[in-house]
């Protein structure tokens, strides 16, 4: 620590406080500014684009300094939090008028990316999560806290791959890991990673602190008693939250045990490829959520995002949601609910700020308005017969006493902050009313007093006045002073007048001189009392907020079902996926022409479709729409199809498109193979797999062989698979794999121009239309013409070469010119003798590397 003796008393105070918070930027309150010094000032000046200056000297050197006005701090804090910085807010808690030496200061809260709760610093449509992990490569404990809602969950996860996929789903703003973990672990590639002392994860201490927080003897009631790693992580989160908030956390009331087996698992690649709530460019437009989310409240939009990113496998829950949506669609009942739900606002985060004791006056006004809207909402719900909706109505309840309390206490349009008062309504508190009246109506009181005293004494020249030295007084001319009543007490003698004070005027003086400051202090005290009373009702209010958010989502899904022509899917016990007239919910919204709907049939007999057809023909759209229909069904929503019948799936995999992972040192093909390996290792007969153009990132031989072997492996696994490819050789797979069928996207050529029809038809495609697509893309005409010449020559010189599945003597399916025929080589002879059914994917990969060395 710096030698404090070299510095001024004020800077000594600063260094002592900064020493306690070395990792945070210190916002040090000085009058109307927050000042930053030394390295904090340099960093803030760069990040916030503010002026770096100097404040005199301390220790013989100029002090780098940067400052921001305290009344506009929110905007700067928001920018710092988005950049991943943490800030310690140091306020003046002493009175400058009475302080000897520097005004007493104290860090009142720490703002970090994962614990921020201020409305202005948050994205209202996204969860803001704090996470912690503990364990090793075999088993991890993961704890997740949303301090802005009170949701607190734990789970245990096997292996880095599953953990990283879960972290990508959660996308925490801040991630805590033990300080004794080795450097460079996969988790550290994420944003907002902070190392904490190993003892912060101590499991015994964590168990004790969690039980104390929830008021229980143990954690058995939460179903996580034996999750020792997760409990250690949760204890670290709780300690970190208390450290940063500097207050109790009454809105953290329970711990939820999340289980991956209860959900449809999507890895990071699948979530990105399906563009659930973030598109491939990082924006929110043209995503699934942008189409299906018309929720009235921000808390419902966040719940919708959680549903989309964590589909369920609980058929009872899903069918209860479906029944609720159907009920809300009857007689357009959702239309009666949505305007009333809009009045509720973001109740979830308002209640969290009340629990954190940093709720602002407008939060209480919004809570008042929300509670006032509940009776009408309850009346509208009385006709809803669906059991799940009735249960939600019971949980929502009404709070007439709290609604009345807030209506009496808070003015209609309060200011943003309590700092300057003007929040509490007149008539709520007699003492406050009197103080405010004294402060605001002192002049009128003095005029009334003067009139009364003139009438009482009969002295017409009597005056009531005030000066800063002697205070309030009654003044009489010297000649009338002897006629002053007995209760007049002499206060000051002037040359031509005498000044007096009376007990009534003295009492008024005592009140009036301090009325403004006392009124503000009283108003702040009343505000704190309001918060305390609300905290006493926090548990049922939070339950109501959760139920209101779910009701909003269900009403939204009913509205979307009506306006997007969605229909109720049916879950069945036998394994199948049947879709009639399925549509892509996002693509059809942006098309200027009608979307071409298509069917899909997968069941016990057909587990895989090999999809061929031209580029831009609709293969990827067809596959993605299938995944989105399945996903929507697994959140309980209606789906964009005329009819859908399906069994529950355990995972949705997508291998669609790739790009280089330059930061990770991985090529496009390496990324593609990593995703393929993940699918081959983890797909089951209950999974849905989308494979698009596997093998295109390497040489023709390698790519075709890998695609072939991967398709055969998935066929043996019996996962529901859509396998799109331009390797027409793969269309012979049904001859060796009975559970595989061919379909194609049709197109036609007219005047050497391609016309995409987008219909999915049985059987393989007859040609690829590659040159027509190139022409459509704007490839120069001479290049297209030269390509046609090359194509004709290749078609005449390349003879069909017998593929493994044709050795039975069956005729080959239509395909492009064989890629092997014009390239005689010993490797081809070896390849022709191999039966792909007899080798594993690993053996195929080994052979490819061996052949590559020889070619």
From Swiss-Prot:
ATP binds at residues 613-620. Pfam families: MutS_I, MutS_II, MutS_III, MutS_IV, MutS_V. It comes from the Bacteria. Keywords: ATP-binding, DNA damage, DNA repair, DNA-binding, Nucleotide-binding. InterPro entries: DNA_mismatch_repair_MutS, DNA_mismatch_repair_MutS-lik_N, DNA_mismatch_repair_MutS/MSH, DNA_mismatch_repair_MutS_C, DNA_mismatch_repair_MutS_clamp, DNA_mismatch_repair_MutS_core, DNA_mismatch_repair_MutS_N, DNA_mismatch_repair_MutS_sf. Transmembrane segments: none annotated. Residues 796-816 are annotated as: Disordered. CDD domains: ABC_MutS1. GO terms for cellular component: cytosol. Belongs to the DNA mismatch repair MutS family. This protein is involved in the repair of mismatches in DNA. It is possible that it carries out the mismatch recognition step. This protein has a weak ATPase activity. This is DNA mismatch repair protein MutS.
